[in-house]
Protein backbone atom coordinates (compact mmCIF):
# COMPACT_ATOMS: atom_id res chain seq x y z
CA UNK A 1 0.00 0.00 0.00
CA UNK A 2 2.97 2.31 0.41
CA UNK A 3 2.29 2.57 4.12
CA UNK A 4 4.49 1.70 7.10
CA UNK A 5 3.17 -1.85 7.55
CA UNK A 6 3.67 -2.70 3.89
CA UNK A 7 7.20 -1.27 3.97
CA UNK A 8 8.09 -3.52 6.90
CA UNK A 9 6.41 -6.53 5.31
CA UNK A 10 8.25 -6.07 2.03
CA UNK A 11 11.58 -5.79 3.84
CA UNK A 12 10.87 -8.96 5.85
CA UNK A 13 9.80 -10.96 2.78
CA UNK A 14 12.85 -9.81 0.80
CA UNK A 15 15.10 -11.00 3.63
CA UNK A 16 13.31 -14.33 4.06
CA UNK A 17 12.70 -15.50 0.48
CA UNK A 18 14.72 -15.76 -2.72
CA UNK A 19 13.72 -12.89 -5.03
CA UNK A 20 12.70 -15.23 -7.83
CA UNK A 21 10.14 -16.94 -5.57
CA UNK A 22 7.74 -14.00 -5.16
CA UNK A 23 6.36 -10.91 -6.84
CA UNK A 24 5.29 -7.55 -5.42
CA UNK A 25 1.88 -6.21 -6.41
CA UNK A 26 0.86 -2.68 -5.50
CA UNK A 27 -2.92 -2.29 -5.53
CA UNK A 28 -3.35 1.24 -6.88
CA UNK A 29 -6.83 2.40 -5.89
CA UNK A 30 -6.41 5.67 -7.76
CA UNK A 31 -7.17 7.38 -4.45
CA UNK A 32 -3.74 7.37 -2.84
CA UNK A 33 -1.94 10.28 -1.23
CA UNK A 34 0.67 11.84 -3.55
CA UNK A 35 3.28 10.92 -0.90
CA UNK A 36 2.21 7.29 -1.16
CA UNK A 37 2.88 7.28 -4.89
CA UNK A 38 6.36 8.68 -4.13
CA UNK A 39 7.05 5.80 -1.72
CA UNK A 40 5.73 3.21 -4.18
CA UNK A 41 7.95 4.67 -6.91
CA UNK A 42 10.92 4.30 -4.52
CA UNK A 43 9.93 0.70 -3.66
CA UNK A 44 9.52 -0.17 -7.34
CA UNK A 45 13.00 1.22 -8.09
CA UNK A 46 14.51 -0.84 -5.24
CA UNK A 47 12.73 -3.97 -6.49
CA UNK A 48 13.96 -3.38 -10.05
CA UNK A 49 17.52 -2.91 -8.77
CA UNK A 50 17.51 -6.19 -6.84
CA UNK A 51 15.59 -8.17 -9.48
CA UNK A 52 12.31 -8.52 -7.58
CA UNK A 53 9.33 -8.46 -9.98
CA UNK A 54 7.07 -5.46 -9.25
CA UNK A 55 3.59 -4.99 -10.68
CA UNK A 56 0.82 -2.44 -10.32
CA UNK A 57 -2.81 -3.60 -10.24
CA UNK A 58 -5.60 -1.13 -11.03
CA UNK A 59 -9.35 -1.45 -11.29
CA UNK A 60 -11.00 -0.88 -14.65
CA UNK A 61 -13.38 1.44 -12.75
CA UNK A 62 -12.46 5.09 -12.35
CA UNK A 63 -12.67 6.02 -8.63
CA UNK A 64 -15.19 8.82 -9.32
CA UNK A 65 -17.29 6.38 -11.36
CA UNK A 66 -17.28 3.95 -8.43
CA UNK A 67 -18.44 6.63 -6.01
CA UNK A 68 -21.32 7.43 -8.35
CA UNK A 69 -22.27 3.74 -8.58
CA UNK A 70 -21.84 2.68 -4.95
CA UNK A 71 -21.81 5.88 -2.90
CA UNK A 72 -18.97 6.79 -0.55
CA UNK A 73 -17.18 3.91 1.18
CA UNK A 74 -18.53 3.20 4.66
CA UNK A 75 -17.98 0.68 7.46
CA UNK A 76 -21.19 -1.12 6.48
CA UNK A 77 -20.44 -1.26 2.75
CA UNK A 78 -16.70 -1.45 2.20
CA UNK A 79 -16.77 -1.76 -1.58
CA UNK A 80 -13.69 0.40 -2.10
CA UNK A 81 -11.02 -2.13 -1.14
CA UNK A 82 -12.61 -5.01 -3.05
CA UNK A 83 -13.32 -2.97 -6.20
CA UNK A 84 -10.07 -1.00 -6.30
CA UNK A 85 -7.52 -3.18 -4.51
CA UNK A 86 -8.27 -6.87 -3.80
CA UNK A 87 -10.00 -7.77 -7.07
CA UNK A 88 -7.45 -5.98 -9.29
CA UNK A 89 -4.63 -7.74 -7.39
CA UNK A 90 -6.33 -11.10 -7.95
CA UNK A 91 -6.75 -10.29 -11.64
CA UNK A 92 -3.07 -9.33 -11.84
CA UNK A 93 -2.04 -12.66 -10.25
CA UNK A 94 -4.17 -14.50 -12.82
CA UNK A 95 -2.40 -12.53 -15.55
CA UNK A 96 1.07 -13.22 -14.08
CA UNK A 97 0.47 -16.94 -13.56
CA UNK A 98 -1.61 -17.42 -16.70
CA UNK A 99 -4.16 -19.32 -14.60
CA UNK A 100 -7.67 -18.43 -13.46
CA UNK A 101 -7.42 -20.91 -10.58
CA UNK A 102 -3.92 -20.26 -9.32
CA UNK A 103 -2.69 -21.36 -5.90
CA UNK A 104 -0.56 -18.78 -4.17
CA UNK A 105 0.60 -17.35 -0.88
CA UNK A 106 -0.26 -13.73 -0.15
CA UNK A 107 1.78 -11.87 2.48
CA UNK A 108 -0.42 -9.20 4.06
CA UNK A 109 0.72 -6.30 6.24
CA UNK A 110 -2.30 -6.10 8.52
CA UNK A 111 -2.11 -5.69 12.27
CA UNK A 112 -4.60 -6.72 14.96
CA UNK A 113 -4.29 -3.32 16.66
CA UNK A 114 -5.73 -1.54 13.60
CA UNK A 115 -9.38 -2.52 14.15
CA UNK A 116 -11.75 -4.84 15.99
CA UNK A 117 -12.26 -6.84 12.80
CA UNK A 118 -8.52 -7.28 12.26
CA UNK A 119 -8.03 -8.30 15.89
CA UNK A 120 -9.95 -11.47 14.99
CA UNK A 121 -7.69 -12.36 12.05
CA UNK A 122 -5.54 -15.48 12.14
CA UNK A 123 -1.86 -15.52 11.23
CA UNK A 124 -2.72 -17.68 8.26
CA UNK A 125 -5.81 -18.75 6.36
CA UNK A 126 -6.75 -20.49 3.16
CA UNK A 127 -9.33 -19.22 0.71
CA UNK A 128 -11.03 -16.64 2.93
CA UNK A 129 -10.55 -13.84 0.40
CA UNK A 130 -9.79 -15.77 -2.76
CA UNK A 131 -10.16 -19.45 -3.64
CA UNK A 132 -6.72 -21.02 -3.93
CA UNK A 133 -5.02 -18.24 -2.02
CA UNK A 134 -3.22 -18.77 1.23
CA UNK A 135 -2.82 -15.59 3.23
CA UNK A 136 -0.15 -15.01 5.84
CA UNK A 137 -0.14 -12.03 8.20
CA UNK A 138 3.37 -12.05 9.71
CA UNK A 139 3.13 -8.71 11.55
CA UNK A 140 -0.38 -9.32 12.88
CA UNK A 141 0.61 -8.93 16.54
CA UNK A 142 3.05 -6.06 16.06
CA UNK A 143 2.20 -2.73 17.65
CA UNK A 144 2.58 0.55 15.80
CA UNK A 145 5.64 1.28 17.97
CA UNK A 146 7.28 -1.99 16.89
CA UNK A 147 6.61 -1.15 13.24
CA UNK A 148 8.19 2.30 13.61
CA UNK A 149 11.18 0.87 15.51
CA UNK A 150 11.75 -1.61 12.69
CA UNK A 151 11.48 1.14 10.06
CA UNK A 152 13.99 3.39 11.83
CA UNK A 153 16.41 0.59 12.72
CA UNK A 154 16.47 -0.65 9.11
CA UNK A 155 16.46 2.88 7.66
CA UNK A 156 13.41 2.22 5.50
CA UNK A 157 11.82 5.08 3.56
CA UNK A 158 9.07 6.81 5.54
CA UNK A 159 5.92 7.92 3.76
CA UNK A 160 5.71 11.71 4.15
CA UNK A 161 1.93 11.41 4.67
CA UNK A 162 2.68 10.34 8.26
CA UNK A 163 4.85 13.41 8.85
CA UNK A 164 1.89 15.54 7.75
CA UNK A 165 -0.30 14.16 10.53
CA UNK A 166 -2.01 11.26 8.77
CA UNK A 167 -2.35 8.11 10.84
CA UNK A 168 -2.45 5.96 7.70
CA UNK A 169 -1.07 6.24 4.19
CA UNK A 170 -3.60 4.13 2.28
CA UNK A 171 -6.28 5.49 0.00
CA UNK A 172 -7.83 8.84 0.86
How should each PLM-predicted stretch be described?
Residues 1:
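Class I SAM-dependent methyltransferase core
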Amino acid sequence: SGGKDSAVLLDLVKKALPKESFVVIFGDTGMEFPDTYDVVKHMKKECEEDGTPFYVARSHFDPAESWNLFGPPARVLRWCCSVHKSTPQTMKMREITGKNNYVGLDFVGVRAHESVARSKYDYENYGKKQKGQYSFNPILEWTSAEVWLYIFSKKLKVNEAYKKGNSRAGCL
